[in-house]
Amino acid sequence: MEKIKLIILLFSLTVFSQSDSPITDDFKSIEKIADSLFKNKNFMEATNYYEKLVKAMPNDFDYSFKYAGSYGLYVESLPRLQQVKHIRQMIKRFETAFNLKKDDIEINRALLEIYLRVPRFFGGGNKKAKMILDNIYSVSLEEGKKSELFYNSF
């Protein structure tokens, strides 16, 4: 009886110790599929795959940023009246990625543009854009100057 317990214990340990690798491989496979869909401009399908990754790993900046970007491009491809339904959700996704890595220039530039283009009523506005501009300056003086030119052109 002790031998059976030992065998079961060893078997379960080997099964659980190997479980990390397939999960990581699954994430990489899902990411490759999503990236491929994104490159082919199938933004809604890519968003669905990125969403799975974000739900599994909510603190991963890359997945959150790709999720926000693909959703944003999907929303941008919609007719104006349909865009209205999705704007707040799009902004929320970008803000989630921003909160994970505030010093990333790409997410800062994306949010700056979104806040400048989207009316305050929908979650945008100059006040939020100015906050992002200040954050960009704190990360990089050169990028801050470029972003300020963009900010002033709006």
What do the PLM-derived regions correspond to, one by one?
Residues 24, 58, 102-103, 140-141:
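Short coil turns that delineate tetratricopeptide repeat
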Residues 53, 96-97, 135-136:
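Canonical positions in the second alpha-helix
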Residues 4-14:
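Sec-dependent N-terminal signal peptides
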Residues 68, 73-82, 113-123, 153-154:
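Short coil/turn linking the two alpha-helices of tandem helical-hairpin repeats
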Residues 15-50, 54-56, 61-66:
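N-terminal leader/linker segments that initiate helical-solenoid repeat arrays
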